[in-house]
Amino acid sequence: MFDPKPVLKNLPNLPGVYRMINAQDEVIYVGKARDLKKRVSSYFQKNLPSARTRLMVSNIARIETTVTRSEAEALLLENNLIKGFMPRYNVLFRDDKSYPYIALTGDTFPRLAFHRGAQRKGSSYFGPFPNAVAVRESIQLLQKVFRLRTCENTVFANRSRPCLLHQIERCTAPCVGFISEEDYRRDVMHASLFLQGKEQQVMDELGEKMNEAAEKMEYELAAVYRDRIQSLRQVQAKQFVSDFNVSDADVIACAELEGQWCVNLVMIRGGHHLGDKSFFPKNADGADLETTMEAFLEQHYMAGAIPPLLIVGASLETAALEEVFSEQAGRRIRINTHPIGDKRVWLKMAHTNAQLALSQRIAQQANQQSRLNALREALGLPESTERIECFDISHTMGEATVASCVVFDKGAMQSSEYRRYNITGITPGDDYAAMRDVLTRRYRKVAAGEGKRPDLVFIDGGKGQLGVAVEVLNEVGLPDIQLVGIAKGEERKPGLEQMFFPEREEPVSLKKDHPGLHLLQQIRDEAHRFAITGHRAKRGKARMHSSLEDISGIGAKRRKSLLTRFGGLDGVKNASVDEIAQVDGISHALAQKIYEELH
């Protein structure tokens, strides 16, 4: 039994971070404090109100603390430690920094593009957007109104006539000189102003251009400006956040149902509602509103883009958060915990979004649980069957063989636990050898205690593949894991699957509408999808390698020049000898050799 008195006696009344550690030497909770002595002492009072906290305290074997210079510094350290240890009793949000942006590149004729990842100098970025769909819808809108190019530079540099986008009035075709650099730059400026929420300024300028064109009796040009203004008015009426006195803000609300939490984030950028995104934290059962909201703010914004205003639906101590966020952003960041008027309406909407998302998630979980129960009953599996792993092999006539392993656990597909395995050193096309290879690599580690042990393993294949799986699990010392081989039925139609068991002579079949079969199909199809996407990527890379890297005289630099100039291997294959010879470092003789090797 842990005795906290010696620890509490020596704790200072200073800001810092504390770590709760269990008997297995695992960090089970990380917290920050303005006053370490008061905060840590609060865990050892009688009659703790939270069952979650009581359970955590009962597992404490020792406590470690780190004193910091300020509460803000403690906040930074706490966030880093939570990311490193992923403690069992901290509310954890998925680390998702891959929000998409709209980019306007720094080219002579800037390109309108979808962007995710590190931002490059010279380009302008607008966002972040909650998802890729919102970005693509916005790009389509910008194409319709401002007609900017979206093609890659390699395509742009090699066009000799306008593409289809010009024909449907979604691009002004700068690639073939149908618009001057000055006029194109003006369109880019208008698009940039629009993305900043300055539609009225854009419409005023377009109105002036329309009037000028009309006075010169250039009525077709005037009609173009008129149509752009009308399109912008339609967008403004649909998307603009009226009476919202800040152009960039995030609105964040939490909802709880049946012990689960959802955080809904509504993004407003440039005065536009870009959409929302819902987050479902781990380890949040028994947590309260303030704990969940604070965990989200710390983990979501500590290393990401932050708008100047955060509107949150929880009463929090915001001073330390505002200090850290402002220092990180290089400008003042405000956190509004008691919004009024229009901001309160938006917070209510975010809360409604969170409730709806949580209800849908719980309903989906219940459906998956009923499917799992039906599968257990139909196949005679124990009630403890929770974690299912499924394997599939993908190749093209033995080329670029890839195996996949997908995981179903806790009532859902666990994509973060999916794995692909490149299969080498076997006879091409030998699926049995490929399955032996992947199962051996996977379960040798599990047997050594380096991975999670599944309750059930699906093998995409019939008796032969199942026999290989039985041999492998016996060899690695895991003979008691339940195995099931899934064979496609006659004509390979869904609903006719047969399931083979090591201990049964005859296969088991389920009716087409059986919920257990639907779960099996979902897991099997996901394994197939994951395997085939990996196979295609590996095959494409291998074919590109064999097509260019095996040609003598073509090193890395020349290969890069060729692929850049023609936009990929297909472009090189479609180029003539004279076109290939125009690439820097490629003589006419070498161009002839490249052409012959590729045809």
Swiss-Prot record:
InterPro entries: GIY-YIG_endonuc, GIY-YIG_endonuc_sf, GIY-YIG_UvrC_Cho, RuvA_2-like, UVR_dom, UVR_dom_sf, UvrABC_protein_C, UvrC. Keywords: Cytoplasm, DNA damage, DNA excision, DNA repair, Excision nuclease, SOS response. Residues 13-91 form the GIY-YIG domain. The keyword DNA repair applies. One of its GO terms (biological process) is SOS response. GO terms for cellular component: cytoplasm; excinuclease repair complex. It is found in: Cytoplasm. Residues 200-235 form the UVR domain. The UvrABC repair system catalyzes the recognition and processing of DNA lesions. UvrC both incises the 5' and 3' sides of the lesion. The N-terminal half is responsible for the 3' incision and the C-terminal half is responsible for the 5' incision. This is UvrABC system protein C. The gene is uvrC.
